[in-house]
Amino acid sequence: MAIASPTFFSATKTDHIDGLISGAYWQLGPDRTISWGLGDFGYTWTTTGLQVMQEAFNAWEAVIDVDFEYIGYVDDYRKSTEVFIQPIDIMLSLHDNTFFNSSSIVGRGLFPNTEFADRIVASEGNNTISYPQPEGDITFNIEHPVFDMSNLGSNAFHIVLHEIGHALGLKHPHDGGLAGYTTYQDAGLSNLDDGFLTLMSYDPTSSIWEYGWASTPLPLDIIAAQTIYGANTTTHAGNTTHSLLDDGLLRTVYDVSGTDTLDASNIDKGITLRLAQGNSTTVDTLSTVYIAVNTVIENAIGTFFNDTIYGEKGDNTLQG
């Protein structure tokens, strides 16, 4: 069980990190566990919905030192404390336009901060008796047209990852969060307020989105979340080959150790591969792969066409 911290996470004085930190965070026990579950409020979760949520939590767990544990399902999303021995930390529920008082809102993730969460749910007619632990809870608008949970590479999945980011304490780069930390704009980092670099950005809007939708946390999200919770030190340990896919998705390769390879041999056209951490390789206008900061990919295998391959600063084997 995690506890919503009563104090704020300290600013790092590094603007591209503080620009994504709200100040709210979970205090973790020795097992590093944050529990999650599904709750009903007139709309029932499907098996596919559960699978999609599991994939989203798995994507976050792969990059931070947190064990996300699925606890179960409750009939009323506000009542996990009455059903289970321990309350569920992050409860996910489905609502509609009436609940949100809007047809344009897709979802909402509450920061893990008691004062903030209680204030939000009070504005919706709840109180600490009817809804005793709202911190970190996430609600989705089932009536919004983009919220299709059948596709892991959809706008909806991108939004699920975004809302989990809020539940972990990440904020939008254009606002100050709870602690009033810097925005990217105030820090002179407006160029980083981009959905290509962080799930938490609103720019560009979905109506003019030109990238693939994210299937993992993005580079700046990983840096910020690892600052709060630490890094996962087991993901892709050992020698790993990461195959590039022309599947229309935006993803980050996070790899902790070994001698690793970026393999583009199944791509049917020449491309430019970049192995250095923080760099990206674009397969087409939608499919893009970032190399996470502190991830070292030593080797590359190109396509059967004309490629340009940039290595990283260590010893590389580059096969064209």
Question: Model features per residue range: what roles?
Answer:
Residues 1-47, 102-123, 128:
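Disordered inhibitory propeptide/activation segment of secreted metzincin zinc metalloprotease zymogens
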Residues 42-50, 141-160:
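Short pre-active-site segment immediately N-terminal to the catalytic Zn-binding motif
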Residues 44-75, 161, 257:
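Zn2+-dependent metallopeptidase catalytic core
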Residues 82-88, 94-101, 106-111, 154-217:
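The catalytic-center signature of Zn2+-dependent metalloproteases
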Residues 85, 257, 266-268, 277, ...:
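Extracellular, beta-strand-rich repeat scaffolds characterized by small/acidic residue-biased motifs
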Residues 233, 272-299:
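Acidic/polar low-complexity surface segments
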Residues 263, 292, 299-301, 308-310, ...:
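Short beta-strand elements of solenoid repeat domains
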